[in-house]
Regions:
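Catalytic and ligand-binding motifs that coordinate phosphates/metal ions
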Residues: 247, 251-280
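Fe-S ferredoxin-like electron-transfer domains
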Residues: 53, 62-213, 222, 227-254, ...
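Eukaryote-biased recognition of intrinsically disordered, low-complexity regulatory segments
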Residues: 4-16
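Short helix/loop capping segments that flank catalytic or ligand/cofactor-binding pockets
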Residues: 88-90, 178-181, 223-225, 232-233, ...
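Cofactor-/ligand-binding subdomain signature composed of acidic, glycine-rich
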Residues: 269-321
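N-terminal cofactor/phosphate-binding cores enriched in small/glycine residues
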Residues: 16-75, 89
Length: 321
């Protein structure tokens, strides 16, 4: 007798039957039927890490809530997204993340999700003073007073002309680590250092980025959901209050640096290039680029308009050959 593999599975979500391709997740099923679940660590081109825990749902027969981004949908499952337990869990997690990290530069989706869940990070108290989070001595974290909220605040790291690492906005979603590691770039320039509340993203031995294994592909920037990792030009504009996506145009083109044929989305504002990304659904890039594709456009400016020659492998505004 020949066994035929199932190509679809059918489950019930919020009382409605939904059918999705076999191997799909609960999150995919929810989105298929238009249910808007919050996600912060999920990336469509990355293996789900279920690190942020903001996509939790109720699964009938399960003692605990399950992460919808990573739980594979099975035939006959009965899932509820709007139970009091599930909604309270998502609300609390978003409040904790928002009280510890600055989410002002996260996507508009995050603001919408927090509003729909009535999440109020300020209820934990005013932010505590910043503490040194990078030290060779473990266990340095001092809990704040009861009327203060512990934060991950620290000065932004501006070490070159390409990247800014502003870890006061980091929620430890691990997307940058996965993109730099075996899921995309295979460079392994960054990882998680420290334990507990002291955990943070770090280069090897906490060296400055230009002295690390980083190849400046910018793929970590592309997946960061909160603005903890950003291109220097975008970060400068946001600090100055001049970044305005409503005024930006996106032009699709093909990178000319080599013959691979990576698609580029060139973002312009007021007639100037401010960012370059790649579409997630492009079969070659999956949203990834190299230093030339992501940052090799700076040569179009010259003189006083050109970025400086500091760090990151740029020479006179051009990526190395």
């Amino acid at each position: 007798m020949t066994m035929t593999a199932r190509t679809t599975v059918t489950a019930t979500v919020n009382g409605i039957e939904v059918t999705v391709p076999a191997g799909g997740t609960i999150l995919e099923a929810c989105r298929e039927m238009g249910t808007d679940l919050p996600t912060m660590c999920f990336g469509p081109t990355l293996t789900p890490a279920n690190a942020c825990r903001v996509c939790m749902v109720e699964l009938e027969g399960s003692r605990v809530l399950v992460p919808s981004c990573s739980r594979v949908l099975e035939d006959g499952m009965v899932i509820n997204t709007g139970t009091a337990r599930a909604e309270n869990s998502r609300k609390l997690v978003m409040e904790l993340l928002g009280s510890a990290s600055e989410l002002d530069r996260a996507s508009d989706d995050v603001s919408r999700w927090m509003e729909s869940h009535r999440a109020d990070p300020t209820r934990f108290g005013s932010p505590a003073d910043a503490v040194a989070r990078e030290t060779p001595t473990p266990g340095h974290h001092k809990p704040p007073s009861l009327d203060e909220a512990a934060t991950v605040a620290e000065p932004a790291k501006v070490e070159d002309d390409l990247y800014v690492r502003d870890y006061s906005r980091c929620i430890l979603c691990y997307k940058c680590v996965d993109a730099c590691g075996d899921q995309h770039q295979n460079t392994f320039a960054i990882s998680v250092a420290g334990r507990g509340f002291d955990a943070h993203i770090s280069t090897e031995f906490d060296v400055a980025l230009p002295g690390s294994a980083c190849v400046y592909c910018g793929n970590c920037i592309a997946v960061c959901p909160t603005g903890a990792l950003e291109g220097k030009i975008a970060w400068d504009m946001k600090e100055a209050g001049t970044w305005d996506e409503s005024k930006q145009e996106v032009t699709r083109t093909v990178c000319s640096y080599c013959g691979v044929g990576c698609n580029l989305d060139v973002h312009t504002q007021d007639g100037r290039i401010v960012d370059v990304t790649s579409p997630l659904d492009h079969e070659v890039t999956l949203g990834n680029l190299c230093i030339k594709g992501r940052f090799g456009w700076m040569y179009v400016y010259s003189g006083a308009d050109a970025p400086s020659e500091a760090g990151g492998g740029l020479e006179g505004g051009r990526p190395p050959s």
